[in-house]
Curated annotation (Swiss-Prot):
It comes from Photobacterium profundum (strain SS9). This is ATP-dependent zinc metalloprotease FtsH. Zn(2+) binds at H441, H445, D519. ATP binds at G219, P220, P221, G222, T223, G224, K225, T226. The gene is ftsH. The lineage of its organism: Bacteria, Pseudomonadati, Pseudomonadota, Gammaproteobacteria, Vibrionales. Residues 1-29, 146-696 are cytoplasmic. Binds 1 zinc ion per subunit. GO terms for biological process: protein catabolic process; proteolysis. The chain crosses the membrane at residues 30-50, 125-145. GO terms for molecular function: ATP binding; ATP hydrolysis activity; ATP-dependent peptidase activity; metalloendopeptidase activity; zinc ion binding.
Length: 696
């Protein structure tokens, strides 16, 4: 509690300090504008006509009153006459002409006291002020606005585009430590000596060693690269400059290089310190071949960064940490020793790492006694740190939605299903024909997945619409897969076609829907890579036939070259077709031999809508009684499975919109679940979930 009060008071004092500074700046600006307004009003008033005392009377009345002996005194001030009457009233009139001698004679003859006022001569100071004030005023206004535009006093003005946007955080502002970072022990070990150097540089210097001037954190999104950089700064207790790679380049030429110079100048003044550049691939992308002409502002920014990091002048005490998930596109000059001496890979966590990450995020969540982080970690292969944080948060939201005080294992299961398979769309109404067709489709995926060798176990099958999917077959690996065998990949090809084949066997070739479009796309991609990249074709051999997919703006080449002849490309297409046909026929034979299981699984899906691994085990064992899923129902705990045959298969006639299905199938590849290494193959060759929708 004391720590919370201290933090709150610190926050309150910080807010009060910021508020006081803001009010002080506002008061200064207000006073300045008031002074300018008063001076301008004084000047305009001095040049404008002055107000005269008394009322104004026409000259004719004045002459007539002289003859009537009503005037006692007349005071002349150039053409203005102030008249005092004998009844002690006064008024003002003006001479129509100068030097009216007759008027003076009439006034003297009428015994009127005549007074003259000498002309007012301005003082020397007033003359100088009147002469120079307009120019001084213009200069002052120009200086004021230039200071405002340039962000005078540390502000962000319109002319401050050449200044660095890096935010400096002092050691007191960074509370993150290595205790808050879990699941990347090797990466923490790599950067701990950096912290030791910042704490005690002499220990390294007396042995002639130099600390790396730059560290590049490499890894997939969500693995904690930015968090690790903050932990380094929090442990080292040094100033920490943070900036994004996209903050350097803007609309003006030369801004990026100017900001790089300004950032390193600020860092040198605060040395020893850390500069953290997030998403450095935005500015550090490999320099191109100059196609298209013109001036590449990003390249000039990169050149300036190369010079600042290791150029003619050293940056003693300034350590640059950068993070990226695209190290392949960075310029080689940026990655050489002397700039980024060390590359630290922050990969996806393994089972133990996921358990540690879950424990970190569960600190702030009240948990039921049945929650086991180790079980959750084993059931979430391929999850990054950000995914696990989202999992804990979703579980807490499920518990709050149910007005619970603690989060149980049930909420974590619901959260995992939502993340891996999508949110349930309970409001969507499907016809019985659509549900039945979807059930057969998903049953085909599940049966093939259970019967082919070296395939990930089937975790759950559902015909509840989730996200943009109408049906889901989820595979969950038993362990983290570092690489994939040929047997596993061919089993994936067979299981991907299981849904289409189930529809074909039940409804006939003419009634097959477009729901398998994404299955076909993914299977074709896997087969093509097996032939052209991974050497799994005896005819083509272990040769790389992949096309050059690098663009010129990523550097290295101006034109793309063709790596194969037309005959070779034709042979590759034939090998891909043969590979797919072989596994397609294998899947057909498996389903044809297990039609009774497919009908039983369809009936279970129609009743329960979602079945798990335990029910699938009962179905595959052809048991007469099938266990109900967890949390199911009030009435029957078991369902009597009625034996059905292919003759009794319904003749469901369903039409579907290809556009809707194609859009829905995009969602099937969002969560690969069998990947924990940088050497892993792309999404298509990982063990993915099968949320392919036969109907839309």
């Amino acid at each position: 509690m004391w720590l919370q009060v201290t933090n709150c008071s610190t926050l309150h004092s910080s807010l009060s300090y910021c508020g006081a500074n803001t009010l002080s700046d506002m008061a200064k600006n207000l006073i300045l504008w008031l002074v300018i307004a008063v001076v301008l009003m004084s000047v305009f008033q001095s040049f404008g006509p002055s107000d005269s005392a008394g009322r104004q009377v026409d000259y004719t009345t004045f002459v007539r009153e002289i003859g009537q002996d009503q005037i006692r005194e007349a005071r002349f001030n150039e053409r203005e006459i102030t008249v005092f009457k004998r009844d002690n009233t006064r008024y003002v009139t003006y001479l129509p002409v100068f030097n009216d001698q007759k008027l003076l004679d009439d006034l003297i003859n009428a015994n009127v006291k005549v007074l003259g006022t000498p002309p007012e001569e301005p003082s020397l100071l007033a003359s100088i002020f009147i002469s120079w004030f307009p120019m001084l005023l213009l200069i002052g206004v120009w200086v004021f606005f230039m200071r405002q535009m340039q962000g005078g006093g540390g502000g962000k003005g319109a002319m401050s585009f050449g200044k660095s946007k890096a935010r400096m955080m002092s050691e007191d502002q960074i509370k993150t430590t290595f205790a808050d970072v879990a699941g990347c022990d090797e990466a923490k070990e790599d950067v701990k000596e950096l912290v030791d150097y910042l704490r005690d540089p002499s220990r390294f210097q007396k042995l002639g060693g130099k600390i790396p001037t730059g560290i590049l954190l490499v890894g997939p999104p969500g693995t904690g690269k930015t968090l690790l950089a903050k932990a380094i700064a929090g442990e080292a207790k040094v100033p920490f400059f943070t900036i994004s790679g996209s903050d350097f380049v803007e609309m003006f030429v030369g801004v990026g290089a100017s900001r790089v110079r300004d950032m390193f100048e600020q860092a040198k003044k605060a040395a020893p310190c850390i500069i953290f550049i997030d998403e450095i691939d935005a500015v550090g992308r490999q320099r191109g071949a100059g196609v298209g002409g013109g001036h590449d502002e990003r390249e000039q920014t990169l050149n300036q960064m190369l010079v600042e990091m290791d150029g003619f002048e050293g940056n003693e005490g300034v350590i640059v940490i950068a993070a990226t998930n695209r190290p392949d596109v960075l310029d080689p000059a940026l990655l050489r020793p002397g700039r980024f001496d060390r590359q630290v890979v922050v990969g996806l966590p393994d089972v133990r790492g996921r358990e540690q990450i879950l424990k970190v995020h569960m600190r702030k969540v009240p948990l039921e006694g049945d929650v086991e982080p180790s079980l959750i970690a084993r059931g979430t292969p391929g999850f990054s740190g950000a995914d696990l944080a989202n999992l804990v948060n979703e579980a807490a939201l499920f518990a709050a939605r149910g007005n619970k005080r603690v989060v149980s294992m049930q909420e974590f299961e619901l959260a995992k299903d939502k993340i891996m398979m999508g949110a349930e769309r309970k409001s969507m109404v499907m016809s019985e024909d659509q549900k039945e067709s979807t059930a057969y489709h998903e049953a085909g995926h599940a049966i093939i997945g259970r019967l082919v060798p070296d395939h990930d176990p089937v975790y759950k099958v559902s015909i509840i619409p989730r996200g943009r999917a109408l049906g889901v077959t989820m595979y969950l690996p038993e362990k983290d897969r570092i690489s994939h065998s040929r047997e596993f990949l061919e089993s994936m090809l067979s299981s991907l076609y299981g849904g289409r084949l189930a529809e074909e066997l039940i409804y006939g070739v003419d009634k097959v829907s477009t729901g398998a479009s994404n299955d076909i796309e993914r299977a074709t991609d896997i087969a093509r890579k097996m032939v052209t990249q991974w050497g799994f074709s005896e005819k083509m051999g272990p040769v790389l036939y992949a096309d050059d997919e690098g663009e010129v703006f990523l550097g290295r080449s101006v034109t793309q070259t063709k790596h194969m002849s037309d005959d070779t490309a034709r042979a590759i297409d034939m090998e891909i077709r043969a590979l797919i046909d072989r596994n397609y026929e294998r899947a057909r034979e498996i389903l044809a031999q297990n039609m009774d299981i497919m009908h039983a699984m369809k009936d279970a899906l129609m009743k329960y809508e979602t079945i798990d691994a335990a029910q699938i085990d009962d179905l595959m064992a052809r048991k007469s009684e099938i266990r109900a899923p967890k949390g199911w129902g009030d009435t029957d705990d078991v369902m009597k499975s009625s034996p059905t045959t292919s003759e009794s298969a319904p003749e469901a006639k369903t039409e579907s919109a290809p556009e809707a299905k194609a859009e829905a199938n995009v969602e099937t590849e969002e969560k690969p679940v069998a990947a924990d290494s940088e050497e892993l193959k792309p999404k298509a060759e990982q063990a993915p979930k099968e949320d392919d929708k036969p109907q839309a």
